[in-house]
């Protein structure tokens, strides 16, 4: 259950951070306006809180592992929202990142 909770929280964090950054991008780079930027800033702020609900108490570990989730989530966002087509190197890199996430967060640790 702890691993499942952690994975759900990583997914929520990715949605908030990547979605927030995308909204800011749309507001500024695509000239959609300040409301898009404001919504992005709110989403980015929400991202900051999501990590605090991770079951692991170590900030550095949680954020380091989240970095790998961010890489995979960013590519997925690009595919689903912006019609980006990752190449094999993007996919290989994303897979390596997920292995890193698993090792950092879920490897057994002696006490």
Curated annotation (Swiss-Prot):
<feature type="transmembrane region" description="Helical">
    <location>
        <begin position="33"/>
        <end position="53"/>
    </location>
</feature>
<protein>
    <recommendedName>
        <fullName>UPF0060 membrane protein NFA_36830</fullName>
    </recommendedName>
</protein>
<keyword id="KW-1133">Transmembrane helix</keyword>
<dbReference type="GO" id="GO:0005886">
    <property type="term" value="C:plasma membrane"/>
</dbReference>
<feature type="transmembrane region" description="Helical">
    <location>
        <begin position="7"/>
        <end position="27"/>
    </location>
</feature>
<dbReference type="Pfam" id="PF02694">
    <property type="entry name" value="UPF0060"/>
</dbReference>
<keyword id="KW-0812">Transmembrane</keyword>
<dbReference type="InterPro" id="IPR003844">
    <property type="entry name" value="UPF0060"/>
</dbReference>
<keyword id="KW-1003">Cell membrane</keyword>
<comment type="similarity">
    <text>Belongs to the UPF0060 family.</text>
</comment>
<keyword id="KW-0472">Membrane</keyword>
<feature type="transmembrane region" description="Helical">
    <location>
        <begin position="62"/>
        <end position="82"/>
    </location>
</feature>
<feature type="transmembrane region" description="Helical">
    <location>
        <begin position="91"/>
        <end position="111"/>
    </location>
</feature>
């Amino acid at each position: 259950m702890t691993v499942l909770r952690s994975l759900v929280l990583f997914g929520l964090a990715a949605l908030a951070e990547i979605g927030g950054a995308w909204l800011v991008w749309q507001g500024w780079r695509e000239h959609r306006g300040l409301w898009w930027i404001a919504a992005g800033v709110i989403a980015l702020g929400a991202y900051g809180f999501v990590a605090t609900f991770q079951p692991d108490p170590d900030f550095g570990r949680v954020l380091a592992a989240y970095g790998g989730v961010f890489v995979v989530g960013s590519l997925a966002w690009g595919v689903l929202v912006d019609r980006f087509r990752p190449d094999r190197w993007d996919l290989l890199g994303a897979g390596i990142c997920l292995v890193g996430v698993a090792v950092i967060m879920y490897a057994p640790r002696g006490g």
